[in-house]
């Protein structure tokens, strides 16, 4: 697997994929009456047409990398590219009076070389017309683009699109599709964070990762009062094609996407990732190694949450490990999973540029039976906040063979918190630090002579208070080492309980330690399950050094 570097905000560079014979798939046309920016020919279109298109495309060889862009676009710097702005007067639904939604397009250029085709679709007649590229759709400002090189190049297409909602119809977008099959959405804070993808291919295998492209979009024209719009997308890559339908609900406090896809495998696929998402975790309450800045925490997401098919709720805090880690959590017909940002307090981040306290969570809710598989989590070492280092997706257990057709239906919730949560006690935070000393004597006049690592897991909610008089029992399981000095502490500021223990190694191994804990009362589970992966230091580092200078 090649390590991927993702540029934050909206500049994740798209990988090179292609669409062979696409012109022939759109060729059964008749001239249409022009209206607004849609200037192409009409063609009957619905989701079944798109499925047939993707199926036909899968029978053809992949077309390879995008052809070169004009030099004036290919050599743009990120700053120059960002200065190119779509002209709001030419927005897709600009002719709808009193509209609640609108769409604008991204310019091709810089690393965005894939020419994505855009179509306007009349939902009543099911007739689609293409929107061709032309320079007058954009304001180039001081980007330094020689627009003479672009005249007449109607096949340049676009790099992607973004959607707006009233009253911010031209100023603050709420949905963005840009680069390969990446897309994002916001909640009421208008702050982008983690990204989703249409599909992941061979993310963690012995072959290079493949980044499928969305190569064409069709937008159903909404009614003026609608706050929901429908978009269809064609996906293409060397190994697979896909027909996608997105029903995007732009609510006041969140964006909900209903997604359905039909996938057609061109070849055998070692690892297929469904509903993939990518995020960033540099440091947090449980991982302090990379927090030598003024910021207490730096992350888009702090945990992987899972609602398993058997009803168990699982919380897995994220790591920024020193070496790449890939973990797979087996399940059957999962009820949901996602990367969550649960801490929304400014003081936890002290960041006036990234505003990590405003970043949304992303929750996946399967809508059909996904069968057996795993929730996959990859954590890549990163030195800072500009690299996305967290990847999560569903991997079906059944191998994908050439000629296979698959169908997945799910919802994506972009919101401050997950739309559902366990009725049991849930993990509030995970903290780690020096062990082997009595709490309240940190570390006292004398440093501990025996090395250990303290772990504190805070639980809130559920029936913790009712269970306390009857006895709360932490059930701790470790893959290696021992848990000692286990304490149960009530913490008034967050009205919950802290379970803390010291982990002592029983060998010189530096392999990751798998930790698991849940709370029990009189034999019954009263909390979700906490999972964590700890990376012990080398044996010669397992000591405390008192480096004070008293003279």
Curated annotation (Swiss-Prot):
Domain of life of the native organism: Bacteria
Alphabetically ordered keywords of this record: Periplasm, Signal
A Pfam family that the UniProt record links to this protein: MdoG
Intracellular or extracellular location(s): Periplasm
Any one GO CC term of the record: outer membrane-bounded periplasmic space
PANTHER family membership: GLUCANS BIOSYNTHESIS PROTEIN, GLUCANS BIOSYNTHESIS PROTEIN D
Name of the protein: Glucans biosynthesis protein D
Originating species: Cronobacter sakazakii (strain ATCC BAA-894) (Enterobacter sakazakii)
Gene designation per UniProt: mdoD
